[in-house]
């Protein structure tokens, strides 16, 4: 290694970087072939070579490191892209990507992150799938803080810097779904609605809605491909973007006051923009609920229903607490309708998540968590739960109940989908109706009878059949 | 339903299809390879500069990760364009070939398109996403501008960096640099909202690195964003000033070399930038500097969240606030422009609360730093081009003790401030003293430039104070504790620095504004200190005073004050002269005497300029003027014109004084004294002036406006009309007016009957006119004063001035006590009287015709008599003439007129006694006595006036007829008089005239007839 270092010191920065890449390819490739099992950790000397000649972190105080110009750096990025494109073995690609960009906890990490951001950004533009796949794995294994930083770089490049560049980013969904799934998770961690800068850009929101609407399974990709018993490292991103997206949908109405002020200032145009945003969030919410239903099918197939945690209770509790704090803080500023909308979405999500087994939480615990939230009718229904049956009947009721519901669940959604779309367009508050099909299965209440009294709505005519079916064993 | 959903999605797809980002990933990959290698990937040929740039632009639009590389590449494109641009200019300058010029033009045109495209793309990006692009593009543009400015500074087409306007014109005519400038301006405008510091910091760093070639950029940006650039430049400069070791002395001592090398460029850049902006935005700079000063002393705002942009960050930093004042002082030291901008209004902010805060801030400073700061402040005050007067006033006001009462054992903050200002003022005076006398000291904290002693240094502080001499003198004359000492010292320095003109102005102001002898002493002190180094001060000062009088810039009070002060200055010499004979004078007295003599000479040189003030409308001014002139001597070389003008003014003033004396006896008497003294001096100067003074005195006494002063009667309208008719030939009255007045009546002017206007037919006699009689005492006093003046003037002879004339009042009838009157002077009075009283010159010879012949001149005789009736002063004047023998000879026509009218009166009188005609009796006695005094009659004949009261009218007529016969037989001729040297008078020997016995025969007859009542007077008439 000393010989290699001395030789590299005499060369120009770009040539030295190329040699380091070549060296990695030779040494790591050989190591993989020689060993039958998983490769051992990288040698320290290799890491030092990478840091000194690719990320230009000086190892010797007396020698000032040579820096590449921006054009040379672009050349290096292009070389890396070409290498990963030409390398046919996925294992080697993963090892080399890890050698280059695994964070070491030293001062070279800043340079690492800068170059990683440029590499991924460039790969998105030129659609380098191998790099995107490696980046997806990197996002899965790295601490969320660094993931957020990468997401920030990409969002700045494609949502802020270059107009209409979002279309380039949109196209990679078909090329690298795994990267997109991880990117959504990172993006939801980045934008938390705390400030105007940390509110999802409209272009991004539109793109995500398009992705998820086109292929809802995108959100479950990482979850499905992960080993079943693997535990997430501490501090990493969540296994699915579902919780992040749910947070967006619930918080969006509470952040509306800023947009409303802007609308007042700028006139009618921004008002229309606000309406468009509401529609997008409504679509996003619907997609999330649909994904929960798909998740149930998947869990059932794997025989992991009610056993595997998809939405951690702690995370949900944190979200509920945050929503409570926001509602309390913003009550003087917002109309009650916005708060009710946020709570409706929260109630719907909780109901569907618990019904589909994504959220494992007892109703008593849920009532405790939601005790400080403002009053909301739907939330009250969700928290009250089904009527308590006599003990002798509880055990036979439950197994019988669930198997009966599952086969019939998808079919009612199909005819309701266009109806919901139609209703959602003009009046966003009407998204409450999207939750109605779930009520018969879990909450047999008199209000359902009241709904039957509206004969004018043809979709409601379908309800008696559904209502009659699940209640038959009880009666 | 699904169809409807698809319909909703369709517009989005269509929208995307229209966007320019329709490159496939493969195409973008090829673009990147082409950009990196410079070779077209499909055709394999090398890209031209233009195509390569266009490739870069496409990547800029599509691949965000390439933006830094693209901007780096575009640097070369801009550089190439600038090189071609300058080469083209140089080719045109050298009248190069057409082909070369054409080639360059083509090249520039190609790259210009590219540059315009780059500019359009960047401008669009900045507009759409300012927060993302503005920091990146602004730093890129500024750095590139700096590089281009420095790299091409040596080209022939590039003007020198000192000519900023030419440099700006060149670079703004180049499309590349203009594009960069516009990009930077756009970025700066966008970044003003959240973080202007970063933008301005980059500008400052580039300015430090590439100055002076980069100054045109700063000038242009500063003109576009003056407020922001000024405030941010100052804020950045302050941070840099603090960061470079201001905080502690130890740090300074340790890193002296490093600090000096790294500190100066930054603050120098700040000074340069603000200097460029000062030509058009001095007001903004002034406001920012003063606001900076105020904010550094005010309490930082509480509970204000810390701004991440740092726009107001320095206000919240205690260290930066403490460093603000030294920073501003340093700025002022390096930039006279900034010093001038601030010093004008800075004193307005120095209120007691602000001073207390300043003191609190500076208490924490080490003594050495405080001394350095004070020295720097003193240096800045002396170098401030404007506002120095206000600074001086502020320092003097603050440093002056307000009360002698000790406030207590613990000094109050005000005392500390006062002491600081006192010390500052002392240091300033010492500093100015060194500067003025051009004696640089080794301890001087700011050594002066190495100018030769022959060329005095320019001191802006003193330059400005030269325009405030009047104010400085006014403040000095207030004689406040310590204050007048400081200001007096400053006046000395200012006079030495400014030269004779300033010294003259200062002395002139002191003479003008001093209100009492104590204040006037300051002028003496100033003259004492200046006379050693400046010569000819007082003549210039008096000339300056005269100029001031001519321009009428002084009000009445000031004018009188000036004249009085000059008079006081002159009088001090006379007093010393009187006392100097017997006693030893002190040094101060000698100096004052020296100044007094010079002032006296100077005033004499400008006498003709002061004399119009004798007739000033304000009594205070005229009194002061007469006082000054009475103390001065008339110059030897005075021209006749000036002399006559002075005489006329002095005589006019004399009559004004007499009138004033009637109103306020005390003050008027003093003024009359001055006036008499002045007239005496004038009469003693030369025969010409004596003649002029006497003539004007006579004319003035007879003037209508002054008749009432001497008991004259107000004229009767009827008499006025008659007189007007009689005086037609002399006064030039219009004949048309006369004809209109009398209608068809014919004017028989000259006819003997027109004189006797006794009344109107049918209405009886004309009612008697009762004139207003003035105060007898006042008339008597004025008469005495007039006679005294005339006697004084007649007693002096030309070329023989007397030291001081006596002011004793003498009785006109007591001829023995009168001082000898010059015969020539008396002649002047006689001639003047004849000219003013006698309406025509016919029959004006000295010889007397027979008494019957007087019928031909009866009208004139009556006119003359009326003059005597209206002007009693004439009797006294004739008496003076009689005393100056033989001058009375020239008044023969007047004497004949009076005698003729008296003879006619007594002949026609039907009264039993002469006492029934008191005026005629008195006039007869006076006339004979006067003729006797003038030695026109022998004593035996002149004594007959003693018997007139005891005779009858007919008898008086007989005696007067005898007088006429004697005068006819012995005509009054000056040749008959002989000068007696021992007495200084002329005498007439009557023995040579022959026997007078036949002329006294009627006297004896009358005596014999009245022997019972006149026997005791017979001895008076013995031959």
UniProtKB/Swiss-Prot annotation, chain A:
Region (Disordered): 402-444
Ranges of Low complexity composition bias in the record: 416-430
Nucleus is among the record's keywords: yes
Major site of localization recorded for this protein: nucleus
Top-level lineage group: Eukaryota
UniProt KW Nucleus keyword: yes
Any one cellular-component term (Gene Ontology): chromosome
Pfam family membership, one: INTS15
GO terms of biological process kind: RNA polymerase II transcription initiation surveillance
Keywords in alphabetical order: Chromosome, Nucleus
Subcellular compartments: Nucleus; Chromosome
Entry-linked InterPro entries: INTS15
Function noted in UniProt: Component of the integrator complex, a multiprotein complex that terminates RNA polymerase II (Pol II) transcription in the promoter-proximal region of genes.
The family this protein is said to belong to: Belongs to the Integrator subunit 15 family.
Assembly behavior: Component of the Integrator complex, composed of core subunits INTS1, INTS2, INTS3, INTS4, INTS5, INTS6, INTS7, INTS8, INTS9/RC74, INTS10, INTS11/CPSF3L, INTS12, INTS13, INTS14 and INTS15. The core complex associates with protein phosphatase 2A subunits PPP2CA and PPP2R1A, to form the Integrator-PP2A (INTAC) complex. INTS15 is part of the tail subcomplex, composed of INTS10, INTS13, INTS14 and INTS15.
Protein name (Swiss-Prot/TrEMBL): Integrator complex subunit 15
Organism from which the protein derives: Danio rerio (Zebrafish)
């Amino acid at each position: 290694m000393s010989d290699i270092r001395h030789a590299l010191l005499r060369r120009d920065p770009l040539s030295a970087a190329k040699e380091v890449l070549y060296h990695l390819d030779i040494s790591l490739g050989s190591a993989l072939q020689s060993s039958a099992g998983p490769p051992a950790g990288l040698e320290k000397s290799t890491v030092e070579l990478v840091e000194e000649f690719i990320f230009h972190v000086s190892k010797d105080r007396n020698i000032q490191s040579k820096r590449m110009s921006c054009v040379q750096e672009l050349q290096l990025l292009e070389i890396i892209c070409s290498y990963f494109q030409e390398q046919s073995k996925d294992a080697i690609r993963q090892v080399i990507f890890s050698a280059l960009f695994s964070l070491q906890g030293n001062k070279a990490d800043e340079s690492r992150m800068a170059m990683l951001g440029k590499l991924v950004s460039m790969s998105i533009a030129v659609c380098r799938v191998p790099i995107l796949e490696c980046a997806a794995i990197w996002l899965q294994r790295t601490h969320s803080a660094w993931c957020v930083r990468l997401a920030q770089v990409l969002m700045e490049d494609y949502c802020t810097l270059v107009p209409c560049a979002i279309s380039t980013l949109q196209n990679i969904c078909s090329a690298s779904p795994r990267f997109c799934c991880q990117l959504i998770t990172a993006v939801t961690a980045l934008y938390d609605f705390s400030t105007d800068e940390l509110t999802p850009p409209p272009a991004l929101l539109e793109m995500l809605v398009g992705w998820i609407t086109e292929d809802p399974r995108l959100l479950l990709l990482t979850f499905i491909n992960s080993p079943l018993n693997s535990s997430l490292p501490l501090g990493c991103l969540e296994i699915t973007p579902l919780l992040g997206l749910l947070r967006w949908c619930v918080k969006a109405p509470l952040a509306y006051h800023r947009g409303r002020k802007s609308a007042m200032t700028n006139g009618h145009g921004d008002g229309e923009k606000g309406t468009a945003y509401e529609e997008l969030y409504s679509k996003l919410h619907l997609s999330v609920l649909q994904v929960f239903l798909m998740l149930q099918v998947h869990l059932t197939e794997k025989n992991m229903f009610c056993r595997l945690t998809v939405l951690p209770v702690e995370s949900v509790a944190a979200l509920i607490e945050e929503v409570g704090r926001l509602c309390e803080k913003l009550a003087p500023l917002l109309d009650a309708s916005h708060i009710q909308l946020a709570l409706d979405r929260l109630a719907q999500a909780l109901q569907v998540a618990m019904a589909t087994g994504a959220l494992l939480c007892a109703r008593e615990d849920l009532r405790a968590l939601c005790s400080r939230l403002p009053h909301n009718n739907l939330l009250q229904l969700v928290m009250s739960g089904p009527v308590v049956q006599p003990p002798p009947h509880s055990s036979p009721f439950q197994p019988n109940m669930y198997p009966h519901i599952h086969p019939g669940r998808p079919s009612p959604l199909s005819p309701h989908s266009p109806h919901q779309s139609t209703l959602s367009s003009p009046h966003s508050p009407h998204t409450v109706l999207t939750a109605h099909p779930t009520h018969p299965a879990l909450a047999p209440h008199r209000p359902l009878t009241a709904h039957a009294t509206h004969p004018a709505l043809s979709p409601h005519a379908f309800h008696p059949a559904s209502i009659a079916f699940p209640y038959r064993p009880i009666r | 339903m699904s169809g409807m959903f698809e319909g909703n999605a369709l517009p989005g797809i269509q929208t995307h299809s229209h966007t320019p980002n329709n490159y496939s990933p493969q195409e973008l990959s090829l673009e990147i390879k082409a950009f990196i290698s410079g070779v077209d990937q499909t055709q394999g040929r090398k890209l031209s500069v233009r195509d390569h740039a266009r490739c870069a632009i496409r990547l800029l639009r599509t691949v965000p990760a390439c933006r830094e590389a693209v901007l780096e590449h575009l640097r070369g494109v801009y550089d190439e364009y600038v090189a071609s641009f300058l080469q083209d200019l140089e080719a045109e300058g050298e009248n190069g070939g057409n082909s070369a010029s054409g080639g360059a033009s083509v090249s520039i045109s190609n790259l210009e398109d590219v540059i315009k495209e780059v500019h359009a793309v960047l401008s669009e990006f900045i507009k759409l996403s300012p927060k993302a692009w503005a920091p990146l593009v602004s730093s890129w543009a500024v750095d590139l501008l700096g590089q281009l400015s420095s790299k091409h500074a040596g080209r022939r087409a590039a003007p020198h960096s000192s000519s900023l306007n030419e440099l700006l014109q060149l670079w703004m005519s180049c499309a590349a640099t203009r594009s960069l400038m516009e990009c930077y301006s756009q970025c700066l405008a966008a970044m003003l909202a959240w973080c202007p510091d970063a933008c301005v910091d980059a500008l400052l760093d580039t300015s430090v690195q590439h100055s002076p070639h980069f100054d045109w950029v700063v000038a242009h940006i500063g003109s576009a964003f003056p407020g922001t650039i000024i405030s941010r430049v100052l804020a950045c400069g302050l941070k840099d000033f603090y960061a470079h070791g201001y905080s502690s002395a130890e740090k300074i001592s340790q890193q002296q070399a490093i600090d000096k090398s790294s500190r100066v460029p930054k603050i120098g850049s700040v000074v340069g930038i603000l200097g460029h902006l000062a030509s058009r935005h001095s007001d903004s700079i002034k406001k920012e500097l003063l606001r900076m000063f105020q904010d550094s002393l005010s309490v930082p705002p509480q509970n204000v969240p810390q701004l991440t942009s740092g726009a107001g960050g320095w206000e919240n930093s205690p260290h930066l606030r403490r460093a603000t004042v030294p920073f501003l002082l340093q700025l002022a030291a390096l930039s006279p422009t900034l010093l001038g901008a601030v010093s004008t209004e800075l004193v307005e902010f120095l209120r007691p609360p602000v001073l207390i805060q300043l003191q609190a801030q500076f208490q924490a400073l080490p003594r050495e730093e405080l001394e350095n700061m004070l020295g720097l402040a003193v240096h800045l005050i002396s170098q401030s081009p404007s506002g120095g007067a206000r600074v001086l006033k502020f320092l003097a006001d603050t440093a002056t003790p307000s009360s002698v009462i000790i406030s207590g054992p613990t000094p109050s903050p005000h005392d500390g401030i006062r002491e600081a200002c006192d010390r500052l003022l002392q240091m300033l005076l010492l500093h100015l003293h060194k500067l003025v006398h051009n004696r640089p000291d080794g301890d001087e904290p700011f050594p002066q430039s190495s100018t030769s002693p022959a060329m005095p240094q320019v001191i802006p502080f003193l330059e400005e104070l030269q325009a405030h001499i009047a104010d400085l003198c006014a403040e000095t004359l207030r004689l406040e504790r310590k204050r007048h000492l400081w200001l007096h010292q400053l006046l000395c320095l200012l006079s030495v620095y400014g030269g004779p003109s300033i010294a003259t102005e200062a002395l002139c102001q002191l003479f003008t504004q001093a209100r009492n002898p104590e204040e006037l002493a300051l002028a003496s002190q100033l003259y004492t200190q200046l006379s050693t180094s400046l010569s000819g001060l007082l003549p210039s000062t008096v000339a300056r005073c005269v100029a001031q009088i001519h321009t009428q810039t002084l009000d009445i009070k000031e004018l009188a004050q000036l004249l009085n002060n000059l008079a006081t200055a002159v009088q001090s010499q006379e007093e010393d002269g009187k006392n100097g004979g017997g006693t030893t004078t002190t040094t101060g007295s000698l100096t004052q005497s020296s100044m007094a003599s010079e002032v006296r000479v100077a005033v004499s040189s400008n006498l003709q300029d002061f004399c119009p003030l004798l007739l000033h409308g304000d009594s205070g001014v005229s009194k002061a003027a007469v006082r000054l002139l009475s103390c001065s001597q008339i110059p030897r070389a005075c021209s006749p014109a000036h002399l006559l003008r002075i005489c006329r003014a002095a005589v006019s003033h004399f009559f004004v004084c007499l009138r004033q004396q009637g109103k306020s006896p005390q003050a008027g008497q003093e003024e009359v004294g001055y006036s008499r003294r002045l007239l005496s001096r004038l009469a003693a100067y030369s025969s010409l002036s004596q003649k002029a003074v006497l003539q004007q005195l006579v004319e003035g006494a007879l003037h209508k406006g002054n008749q009432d002063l001497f008991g004259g009667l107000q004229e009767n309208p009827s008499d006025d009309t008659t007189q007007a008719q009689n005086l037609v030939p002399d006064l030039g009255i219009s004949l048309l007016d006369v004809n209109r007045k009398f209608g068809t009546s014919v004017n028989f002017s000259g006819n003997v009957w027109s004189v006797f206007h006794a009344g109107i037919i049918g209405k009886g006699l004309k009612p008697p006119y009762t004139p207003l009689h003035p105060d007898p005492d006042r008339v008597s006093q004025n008469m005495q004063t007039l006679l005294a003046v005339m006697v004084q003037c007649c007693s002096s002879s030309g070329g023989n001035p007397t030291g001081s004339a006596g002011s004793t009042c003498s009785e006109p009838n007591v001829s023995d006590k009168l001082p000898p009157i010059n015969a020539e002077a008396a002649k002047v009075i006689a001639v003047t009287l004849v000219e003013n009283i006698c309406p025509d010159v016919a029959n004006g010879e000295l010889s007397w015709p027979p008494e019957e012949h007087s019928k031909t001149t009866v009208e004139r005789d009556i006119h003359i008599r009326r003059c005597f009736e209206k002007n009693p002063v004439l009797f006294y004047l004739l008496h003076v003439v009689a005393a100056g023998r033989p001058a009375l000879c020239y008044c023969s026509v007047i004497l004949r007129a009076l005698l003729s009218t008296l003879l006619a009166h007594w002949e026609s009188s039907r009264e039993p006694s002469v006492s029934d005609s008191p005026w005629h009796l008195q006039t007869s006695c006076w006339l004979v006595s006067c003729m006797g005094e003038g030695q026109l009659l022998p004593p035996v004949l002149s004594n007959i006036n003693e018997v007139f009261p005891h005779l009858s009218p007919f008898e008086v007529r007989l005696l007067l007829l005898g007088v006429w016969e004697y005068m006819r037989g012995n005509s009054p001729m000056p040749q008959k008089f002989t000068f007696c040297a021992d007495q200084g008078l002329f005498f007439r020997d009557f023995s040579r005239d022959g026997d007078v016995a036949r002329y006294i025969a009627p006297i004896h007859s009358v005596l014999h007839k009245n022997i019972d009542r006149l026997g005791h007077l017979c001895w008076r008439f013995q031959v």
